[in-house]
Amino acid sequence: TLDGDHYVLNGTKMWITNGGFADLYLVFGSVDRQKKQKGIISLIVPATSPGIRHGEPIDKMGQRASNTTAVTFKNVRVPKENLLAGEGEGFKKAMLALDITRPMIGIGAVGLARTAMELATQYAKQRIQFGVPIANHQAVQFMLADMAIGIDAARLLVWRAASLADQGMRNSREAAIAKAFAADMAMRVTTDAVQIYGAMGYTKWHPVEKLMRDA
């Protein structure tokens, strides 16, 4: 709500990455709900502003090293000069930001999956079953091959999206494809890595269970 030379913020947002550590918040909020997305603006808000409170870190299944909290705003006054994008522009800025962050998430998924594949490959060469390493069994070889196919495909999709961004070109479609494919691929690869480890994969003695949760 605009009040003189200040915007007044009220509300709560969940799932804020680094919510407990941030010095600044980039806040997207509505000044006119009747205008729907065209009524959204964005503001730069210092985390020390009176009326801001962040919750305790959310106890997540995966990505536990990432500080994730709720952030509550209660009558937080923000000067008009902190306006980053006004009505009709805030939503556009939010969508354009995804063109950068989606490839970043995608490449994280690629790295996570690659680690899982390398660990599973190493374990498969060491684990002896029926007198030979399980890496010699065709069923395991198929799983490792599918991992490599998915990882390489995801990496290329991410590179394409990132290359377009580096050139200042619009990459909304490519960024969305890269993130979606890489995220699904990481889930498949880490699940198969746990399978290759067998019962050991279900324990915290080996890191593949963590990779699966993070995926």
What are these language model-derived features?
Residues 46-47, 78-79, 133, 198:
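Short, solvent-exposed coil/turn linker segments
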